C-alpha cells in the first residue's frame, strides 16, 4: 500500500475519534442538524476504520509468521507457512476493500429521490409498461424497507400511466437507484394484439436526488409562476371539489412541476417546490457529468435520459442492461422487484470506473 494512502487512512482514523468525541458533547446532541451530520460522517468512517485496523493486524500477523519460519521445530515452521498464507490473503482482500472505501463519495448517495416514469414510443402499451416499471420499483423499495408516495400521476387510457412521479425515501435510496435513469425498452405481445405479434415500446425513467436546504439550491420567488388547478384521477370524494393541485414554472429554465396528490394546496405547493429544487439540482449534476464525460467515457454514470439502458424481452424471459452487456434470464424475478442482480453489477462497474480514473491521475 502506498504511503500516501496510509497517511490518508491515519487521518481518517483521527477524524473518526474526533467525531466520536463530538457526538457525546451536550452542545452537539442538542443541535439536531449538527448531530445528524456528524452521525452520518461517523457511519461513513466506521467501515474504513474497521477495515484499516484489520489490515494493520494482518500485517502484524504476517511479520510474526515470518519470524516463526526461523524456528527449528518443523511443525512450527509448517504452522508459520499456513499463517503466512492466510495473512497474505487477508492483506490482499483488505487492500482491495480499502481502495473501494476510499473512493470519492457521491454527496447525494444518502438522499431520498424523486422517481419520474414517462411513457415514450408505443402508445397504450408504453403506458401499461410505465405501470409495470412503477410496480417493479415499488416492490424493490418495499424489499429494502423504503417508503414510496405518489406525487402526481396521469393514467393511461388502457391502464398504467402516461406519466407518474413518486418520492422514495429511506436509507441510501439514491445510491441504489441513480443508475436507473434512461430509456427502458420492452418487447412483448400486448394484451390488445390479436395477431400475436411482438411490439417494441419504451419508457423513460429519471431519478433525481431530493434537494434539501443543505444543497444550496436557492430559488428567487420572482423566478417562479404558480398556477392552481383541480386535481384529477383517483383520490376519493375530495378530488375535483377544490383547486388544490399546484403547477410551478421556473421561468429562467422553463422547468415545470406539478403536484396534486396531497390533500391541501399548501402541502401540494411544498411538495412541488421540493421537486423543483430537486430538478434544478439534477440539472447541475447532469452538467457536471457531461463535463466529466468530455474527458473520459463512463459507461454507467452518464444518466442521459435519451440513452437506451435496458431491454425487457418477455418472450425470452430476458433482461439486458446495455451499458455493461449484462443479460439475465430472470425477467419475472426482476419485475417482482429483485433488482439487486442488476443494480449491484452497475455499482461495481462504476467503482471500477472511479478506480481507473484515480490510477490515471
UniProtKB/Swiss-Prot annotation:
It holds the Pfam family PCRF. Methylated by PrmC. Methylation increases the termination efficiency of RF1. Keywords: Cytoplasm, Methylation, Protein biosynthesis. It is found in: Cytoplasm. InterPro entries: PCRF (IPR005139), Pep_chain_release_fac_I (IPR000352), Pep_chain_release_fac_I_sf (IPR045853), Prokaryotic/Mito_RF (IPR050057), RF-1 (IPR004373). Residues 287-313 are annotated as: Disordered. The modification N5-methylglutamine is found at residue 237. Residues 287-297 have a biased composition (Basic and acidic residues). The keyword Transcription regulation does not apply. GO terms for cellular component: cytoplasm. GO terms for molecular function: translation release factor activity, codon specific. The keyword Protein transport does not apply. Belongs to the prokaryotic/mitochondrial release factor family. PANTHER family: LD18447P. Peptide chain release factor 1 directs the termination of translation in response to the peptide chain termination codons UAG and UAA. This is Peptide chain release factor 1. The lineage of its organism: Bacteria, Pseudomonadati, Pseudomonadota, Gammaproteobacteria, Thiotrichales. The gene is prfA.
